[in-house]
Amino acid sequence: MASTIADNADNNGNSKDSVQYLRKVLTSESSPLAQRFRALFSLKHLASSKPPTEETLPAIEAIAAAFSSPSALLKHELAYCLGQTRNLDTVPHLRKVLEDTQEDAMCRHEAAEALGALGDAGSLAILQRLRDDESEEEVVRETCDIAVDRILWETSKDSKSEKLKQSDFTSIDPAPPLPLSSAEQSIPELKQILLDASLPLFKRYRAMFALRDMCSPPDLPTAVPAIEALAEGFKDRSALFRHEIAFVFGQLSHPASIPSLVATLSDKNEVGMVRHEAAEALGSLGAEDGVEETLKRFVNDPETVVRDSIIVALDMAEYEKSGEQEYILEQPVAA
């Protein structure tokens, strides 16, 4: 059974060395991409410590140091991880990425989403400005729109009074699920909200995460019908929306999502942001028959972000089959 970096640090008294080692791997362009991702998730574990430890800030700074990488895939994952830490020391790093118009739109979108996940009211002005800037990339504007609504919801009375279903997922989502009511909403009702393009994206996302929570545990009678409803979201005009459907399927790791994920990855007319998310979602299903073989068909895909995602997805598939406890990078033990 593999132990986490944090466990090793506590046992060996060299946690500072662990952060330095992980930072070196994460920021090295010569390190294999899959190894860098494992280093990132190890650092995320340390950066998310509650209460904070002496490794928390160095871990945050180590993650942020990798924003100099040319890999859009890696940088967008850095932003996601910082947003999951619940630590406002990450905010300056995320704002810098979001406001850099030379940065890849996928990375800027993830930085905006992370600021929303952190509930950082101090970032509202930046998010609102970019949301309303018609010259901005659509994916950035849409993400800022959702992030603004999430922060306003989190700081409102509604967030205190709404009764939400306890989720099996520990992630900080772009939107909470729709609240429970006296009459529980059916899958067709949630699907109608999910697919209604006239509604605010925030509300549609709330329906998305309500449907997600109806799929866990995977043997629930609602699981497959809810997945089928979510899969209809792949027809939406918004690339941001489609990529979030793929992300949710990655969280669920339910075999019923495989056909729609394979179709999305295989669609060469689909944007890279969506195809890459489908690839990583399939990586989480790597123990299922045929998935690994499907992923290998795209190792030479012409789109860089898809090729990179296949590398990570295949590593995730190996992890799923290996029985490892954590998807992390362990520091080699000195002889």
UniProtKB/Swiss-Prot annotation:
Q: Which domain of life is it from?
A: Eukaryota
What gene name is listed for this protein? LIA1
Is Ribonucleoprotein found in the keyword set?
no
* PANTHER family according to UniProt: DEOXYHYPUSINE HYDROXYLASE (PTHR12697:SF5), PBS LYASE HEAT-LIKE PROTEIN (PTHR12697)
Task: Please give the organism.
Answer: Coccidioides immitis (strain RS) (Valley fever fungus)
Which cofactors? Answer: Fe(2+)
The HEAT-like PBS-type repeats are found at 74-100, 107-133, 203-233, 241-267, 274-301
What's the short name of a Pfam family annotated to this entry?
Answer: HEAT_2
Which Enzyme Commission number(s) are listed? 1.14.99.29
Entry's cofactor comment: Binds 2 Fe(2+) ions per subunit.
The metabolic or biological pathway listed in the UniProt record of this protein is: Protein modification; eIF5A hypusination
Query: Gene3D superfamilies in the record, alphabetically?
Result: Leucine-rich Repeat Variant (1.25.10.10)
Q: Keywords on this record?
A: Cytoplasm, Hypusine biosynthesis, Iron, Metal-binding, Monooxygenase, Nucleus, Oxidoreductase, Repeat
Catalyzed reactions:
[eIF5A protein]-deoxyhypusine + AH2 + O2 = [eIF5A protein]-hypusine + A + H2O
Question: SMART domains from the xrefs?
Answer: EZ_HEAT
GO MF term list: deoxyhypusine monooxygenase activity; metal ion binding
As for what it does, the entry says: Catalyzes the hydroxylation of the N(6)-(4-aminobutyl)-L-lysine intermediate to form hypusine, an essential post-translational modification only found in mature eIF-5A factor.
| Places the protein is found | Cytoplasm; Nucleus
Q: Which residues bind Fe cation 1?
A: 76-77, 109-110
> Per its record, how is this protein called by name?
Deoxyhypusine hydroxylase
Q: Name the residues that bind Fe cation 2.
A: 243-244, 276-277
Please give the family membership noted in the entry. Answer: Belongs to the deoxyhypusine hydroxylase family.
The record's InterPro entries line, in alphabetical order, gives: ARM-like (IPR011989), ARM-type_fold (IPR016024), Deoxyhypusine_hydroxylase (IPR027517), HEAT_type_2 (IPR021133), PBS_lyase_HEAT (IPR004155)
- GO cellular component terms listed in the entry, alphabetical order: cytoplasm; nucleus
